[in-house]
């Protein structure tokens, strides 16, 4: 007895999106299959289009075996709507009380602080006018009309595409529409049932001292090395100890230039003084990144329950949000966004929800380069020491270069790097193409 699973696409019906499993008698025809589907879902057999592996099954008198439907097959059924159905105005359908009576909804919002909190996240502009009945009524009606128009447009589009059920391109467009609906539904479900995922998570910082200078360190177990910015190294007075033989390029989300390495300096954490090595790197948004190398060396544990970085004998509390440096937050405010429910914006990297217009959306194409790389991009291991002369003091990058084009093109073709990266490698290697290649080999 063949057993098939059927995915039903029937917009505007209770069966839309359902998965139906049927056990069919041996020798059943395609017409019989449609009859079984109609009996289970009340969807007219004449409106059903059956698809196997994306291809329509149209020979109704053939048996399932003859048209290639075997036991365990997955079928798709797309129901063609009555052509007159899209002409039925949406207003003629009964609407829930909340949609037909804006004042009833307003009173519910006024009485229920929990509803106010939800509305503050979903539609802060509407919440701001809840005490003005006239403005509320106008805004509510505007939102209701927009939703009805969007639904009517969607139904009309599906109806037009369904006029030719055997057009592969039309069915692909219907599939895209349905897929996008599922994405929006999934976003709405997360927004309603798991709103915590849209709250910005603040990074973990601790207070430290390096060479007697206070520094707020970002704790990042995803970074392989402990990293310090050149400005911070200057403030702490350890730039003079930097070994430029360890210069190179770090790769992750974008690239960052490694100026060198300080092999030994003292860092004070929670009253304990610990020897530490620092990789000095440009292009980071933090002064000091306390990486996995030091976390493992001192057997540190990130204890989120205690909100502390725990060593064997001390616990160092993570900084409160108000004490965290603002440069990372400013970078997050300029991150790219995607559209969320009710006009909100959701950060593409952080997942944080903001009111519409709450940030300046940055095109993803502008995010390439070291400054766009998040702290975790520092997890790229520092290159091994160069074999010859130390690197010169960090010259400013430039597209125009005095290096031979042949050398630049050679590095670009060998390692698939951008022109600017090839020039930077040649600058580090004082123009020696072989030493520049060792920068990329790490």
UniProtKB/Swiss-Prot annotation:
Cellular compartments annotated: Cytoplasm
GO biological process, one term: protein transport
Annotated ranges, domain UBA: 402-442
Record-level GO cellular component terms: cytoplasm
Gene Ontology molecular-function annotations: aspartic-type endopeptidase activity
InterPro entries: DDI1_N, Peptidase_aspartic_DDI1-type, Peptidase_aspartic_dom_sf, UBA, UBA-like_sf, Ubiquitin-like_dom, Ubiquitin-like_domsf
EC code(s) of this entry: 3.4.23.-
SUPFAM superfamilies assigned: Acid proteases (SSF50630), UBA-like (SSF46934), Ubiquitin-like (SSF54236)
Annotated transmembrane regions: none
Keywords of the record: Aspartyl protease, Cytoplasm, Hydrolase, Protease, Protein transport, Transport
One Pfam assignment: UBA
Keyword Magnesium: no
Active-site residue list: 220
Residue ranges constituting the Ubiquitin-like domain according to the UniProt record: 4-84
Keyword Transmembrane: no
Region (Disordered) residue spans: 82-102, 333-403
Biased composition (Low complexity): 82-96, 364-402
Origin superkingdom: Eukaryota
Assembly mode: Binds ubiquitin and polyubiquitinated proteins.
Function as written in the Swiss-Prot or TrEMBL entry: Probable aspartic protease. May be involved in the regulation of exocytosis. Acts as a linker between the 19S proteasome and polyubiquitinated proteins via UBA domain interactions with ubiquitin for their subsequent degradation. Required for S-phase checkpoint control.
Family assignment from sequence similarity: Belongs to the DDI1 family.
Entry protein name: DNA damage-inducible protein 1
Name of the coding gene: DDI1
